[in-house]
């Protein structure tokens, strides 16, 4: 039976690269594309070396672990020992979850089993042996996406709620600094784009918002013409439907900021996919905070060490 080494190598190179990318997304690591591709190439070398006199070494677990060390080092570099092991263990986790998921789905579709010498052999009509290209190319990205979303959900659940954080809102090239409260009760999102909405007191924004826009935020239902909005702010205005206790559906005036920056657990988190909703109610009687932070912002933002 002919073996298409180039196709096998290309498949492994692609899978190793996607696993490293998934690792970077989960840990929110910054990476360069050429380093990511080189890391995937290092992992795929095992396939090529399997067809050399060194093939007996390539099947040894120690060699495979050594290759994974070099893959992670090439992709993310080395800053300190903890940084390296976080990357390495997350890479193993992604490999086991996605690889195990593929194997589980593969065996789910098996309809023929044969027991030989106390070993189970399977036959896979239409799926290839053991797993067809189409099965891998479709299933692998889907399982990667599923794994990433599940990890994000776990991270949101583990966030310490009712915690005050420093917040900077960059809006129309102006920066506002304030305190924010991470509140699990704030699950408001734009229904069209699924963009999370943080709530900010109107008093915190009055220094930079035009008077007409501030008046409109008090009674959004009165909006009738686009001319009511200053053209400088028109592209930043959004209307988000929401429901409060004892009241019917209402509209909240929200703004699209240039960026929101949070300081959470010694990390600076920068978020661009966020809306700033304007509230005319008092969020904190003792004025401990001026905004309510959507918990998802902690997960979706770009993280860097706080200076």
UniProtKB/Swiss-Prot annotation:
Keyword Transmembrane: yes
Gene Ontology MF terms: aspartic-type endopeptidase activity
Principal location: membrane
Active site: 183
InterPro entries: SpoIIGA
Superkingdom, natural source: Bacteria
Cellular component per GO, a single term: plasma membrane
Enzyme nomenclature, EC number: 3.4.23.-
Localization terms from the record: Cell membrane
Key word Kinase present: no
GO BP: asexual sporulation; proteolysis; sporulation resulting in formation of a cellular spore
TM spans (from-to): 7-27, 36-56, 57-77, 89-109, 127-147
Keywords: Aspartyl protease, Cell membrane, Hydrolase, Membrane, Protease, Sporulation, Transmembrane, Transmembrane helix
Membrane protein topology class: Multi-pass membrane protein
Family of the protein in this entry: Belongs to the peptidase U4 family.
Function: Probable aspartic protease that is responsible for the proteolytic cleavage of the RNA polymerase sigma E factor (SigE/spoIIGB) to yield the active peptide in the mother cell during sporulation. Responds to a signal from the forespore that is triggered by the extracellular signal protein SpoIIR.
Quaternary structure, from the entry: Self-associates. Interacts with SigE. Interacts with SpoIIR.
Protein name: Sporulation sigma-E factor-processing peptidase
Source species: Priestia megaterium (strain ATCC 12872 / QMB1551) (Bacillus megaterium)
Phylogenetic classification of the source organism: Bacteria, Bacillati, Bacillota, Bacilli, Bacillales
